[in-house]
Amino acid sequence: MASAAVTPKLGWVQHQVTNGLHAVVGQVCRHPIHTLLVTALIAATTYLHVLEGTFRAANLGPGSKTDAAPFDVQSFLWGSRSLRLGETSSWRWQVGDLSEATGDGQVNHHWALVTLSFPGASVDDRSPAFLWNALPDSVGAEPITPTSNFFTSISNEFSLAFRVPYTQLSDFLEAVEFVASDKEDRSWAIRFPHGEGKPISLGRWLGNSWLSFLHRAKHAETVDMAIIGLGYLALNMTLVSLFRAMRQLGSRFWLAASVLLSGAFAFVFGLGVTTACGVPVDMLLLSEGIPFLVLTVGFEKPIRFTRAVLYASNQLRRGLQQRDVADKHDSRQRHMIPNAMLFAINREGWSIVQSYLLEIGALALGAVFRPRERFGQFCFLAAWMVLFDAILLFTFYATILCVKLEVTRMQNPGTLDLADDQHGPRIFGYKVNPTSLARWKLIMVGGFVLFNVLQLSSFFYRIMGGFMTNAALTPTTVSPFKVAANGLNDIYLAARAGGVETWVTVLPPIRYVMEASGLEMSAGRRPVFDGVLAGLESPLGRLCLMGALVFSLYLNNHLIPAARWHFSPGAPKESAAPAPPSSPASVPSAVPVPAPSSRSFEEIEALFKANQAESLTDDELAELCLRGKIAGYSLEKTLESIASAGSSSTATTRLEAFTRAVRIRRAAVSRTPSTRDLSGGIQESLLPYRNYNYELVHGACCENVIGYLPLPLGLAGPMVIDGQAYFIPMATTEGVLVASASRGCKAINTGGGAVTMLKGDGMTRGPCLGFPSAKRAAEAQRWVESPVGHQVLTDAFNATSRFARLQTLTVAQAGTYLYIRFRTTTGDAMGMNMISKGVEKALQAMTAHGFPDMNTITLSGNFCADKKSAAINWIGGRGKSVIAEATIPADTVRKVLKTDIDALVELNTAKNLVGSAMAGSMGGFNAHASNLVQAVFLATGQDPAQNVESSSCITTMKKIDGNLHIAVSMPSMEVGTIGGGTILEAQGAMLDLLGVRGAHPTDPGANARRLARIVAAAVLAGELSTCSALAAGHLVNAHMRHNRSAASSEKK
């Protein structure tokens, strides 16, 4: 009950989400330039706001150092770690809170471990002696052994470590703020954790960033570094896979770049919301977490959406190409791209949204359960990033994809003949050369990009004195044993020896930079880049850039619609030679979706009821089907009546009406709400429907037709059967089958061919009769088996057809039920309908001859037995009972079949006879007779379901006079050459190939009997070849070579 209640709700949610995506994507496709403009402006505003708020706050926050500001020790304590050692911690280092150490009056020993790093220091400077002169006597700093690792040599960094009483830390840091170097005009200066508010050059900023990276790497865990390195390596591989996937879809650069740009926008939006909510974001955690977030979320959803859109676009394009040339210039061309987007939404929209919801939910759980930890803070940011990525996928990226498809459609002459190919579009009433147009567009778009890049750079280099953070971007805590392991060991030994409670605060390493003693550069040597940025700061520079941006956007907004919809009002240009019509085998049959109807449903229904349905479009008729006004199964009848009632100028043939019915049914099926998630793609699928004679199908072979299935058809042989050579047609999707049968035919031909015998010919039908009592049923059985009753039933039966002649009656009783098995000839027809009509008349005659109390329970009581394996068919036969035999020379067995006679005989006995008996098989004493029977049945229009009893077969093999004798006995072969699927054109052609199509002109039933002999001979060839392959051990290798082909690549 619960599951039943949930399913409709899920379907409703899916329907609402899909409709919402339809509305959003439809709007952005109608206004692509506006969508790109709004998204770009919002993104630019957001990242400028984030940058300005972040870096200005950083510059004015704690730790800023100006000439007028006092020395701030707290800025150096950010990220420090305090440890305690004593009896309370069992003389082990224990992490503690700094407030406990500074507020506890019992603590007599509180040390600060300070590491000073001098990048690129000279050999003469590699001694602490040059610091002593700067230290006052009141500072009791003691040098200790600095801690080094692998990255020390890479960074070319010289470090000094000191143990300073915590109460004297401020005096020590102020004393070592500036340190003299071996160069008179330069000195070492502390690089403050949060900058000094001074602008720096681009090269210096990059250098500081590299040194900062090496500095962090030197004090990081090796395992952490390896994991982060693997993360970034995998990130690069993910980016490469994105570009490769988009390249396979036909875009070398722009679509992949658009996906990355959309992801960058999502990051900016997510960071803006996160900082606005007051959630602190760790910049180092960002650098560590973003690669793994990208690896987890990936680019699979944009790729899926792109693939679905391109697939739908290609299908619609193929559908338009199958129409006449005049149809290429109607409104369907305009709606091709939006319809492709909507089809992609139907196919992948809900699945993509579902994936996004799962990812957002998982990240939200991480943010809720661990809100105050770095992991929870990153989950909060990541959840917003994924949310904005989902929004941008169906807005910003969908717009770019729509524009890309429009450009591709305009550049493809096979898709649409543009009227302005030779003259170009017009701007403000003037013709524009396409080359100049491309150059102008490149300059304008480049101006927009340059404006944003320089605006971003101006914030970096105007404000940053290094790599900065603000209150929202806090530093990470240092690892004390990575930074000062040697110093901690020295303090541990001293404290343990003296038994003194000791606190140690390990500061993050303090880095020095080499600075000029005076002004580093004069006004006359101002960097060119800074001059450019200063120029951009002026009102005139900003005004010029904004003007160029507005003009670029206006130009694109004017050009793209002009190129999309500017077609010639006259007739289309005539091509040099008309293209030949596409055959159904060469072009898949995709259905172009018509433009939405402008008439309301009430108007459509009124026209239909007023017998004016000939004026309705396919889309409107499909809507009538969906609303239940036209039954789906009666579309052929409805459209046939519409065609016959139309005027002479609009009259269509019966075949055209039936083809249109199939097309409308496909549209109705694809739009059925209850199955749209599964059947929504049937309208534009590769299932063909054109160029088929549905007049032969209607009322004979199939109902609710939506197309036809092309099936591979092969020919085995030629094979000599009863002295006549035949090619045997086989329709199958199983590799090796036709090849194997051909090998069997070759082997049989060397022995003179196959010889067949027809042992019986009679179709059966077994009705079930009910009587008031078992005694009454027994009386009826005696009457049926008596000469009088037999004659009455025979006369009534034979009167129904000139071909039907009753042969035998087999009667069986079960309680009050009586089963009578009628067996009769049926000419060249398979005969099920013929015998059913005769049985019905015979039972009426029986009722009139003394059995008015008889009740016909069913006309087919499974005593036939039809489409079921049964012993009565195996023993008594049904249809044609055929035997086929052949003698294979021993030399052929060795050279052609690659085995020997004794092995074949033993295999047949052990497998086909004993093995089937052990399995309790009924008529299955063969290797694979059903394979051959079904393949020939499909090729010649037989009833596929009757393969069940027709495949009953026993294969025998003997060694006679040194040669192999093989025979197959098939007692219930049910075939016909008229009626059913034999009326179809393709199947009829295969009957012509065998010379057995239709009824025999002089000998009724001869064609059907000949077909049964051919089928039995084909089974004989298949059995011989397959058993030989099994005996030689070649079966698996043959199937792996011929039936396991790799998927073909679309790229040629």
From Swiss-Prot:
Entry keyword set: Endoplasmic reticulum, Glycoprotein, Membrane, NADP, Oxidoreductase, Transmembrane, Transmembrane helix
This protein's pathway: Polyketide biosynthesis; lovastatin biosynthesis
Gene Ontology terms: biological process: coenzyme A metabolic process; ergosterol biosynthetic process; isoprenoid biosynthetic process
Compartments where located: Endoplasmic reticulum membrane
Catalytic activities: (R)-mevalonate + 2 NADP(+) + CoA = (3S)-3-hydroxy-3-methylglutaryl-CoA + 2 NADPH + 2 H(+)
Database matches in Pfam families: HMG-CoA_red (PF00368), HPIH (PF13323), Sterol-sensing (PF12349)
Membrane protein topology class: Multi-pass membrane protein
Uses described in the biotechnology field: Monacoline K acts as an inhibitor of HMG-CoA reductase involved in cholesterogenesis. Its hypocholesterolemic activity might be useful for lowering cholesterol levels in the blood and reduce artherosclerosis and coronary heart disease.
Stretches the record annotates as Catalytic: 618-1044
Main location: endoplasmic reticulum
Low complexity biased stretches: 584-594
List of catalytic residues: 734 (charge relay system), 867 (charge relay system), 943 (charge relay system), 1039 (proton donor)
Enzyme nomenclature, EC number: 1.1.1.34
Protein name: 3-hydroxy-3-methylglutaryl coenzyme A reductase mokG
Gene responsible for this protein: mokG
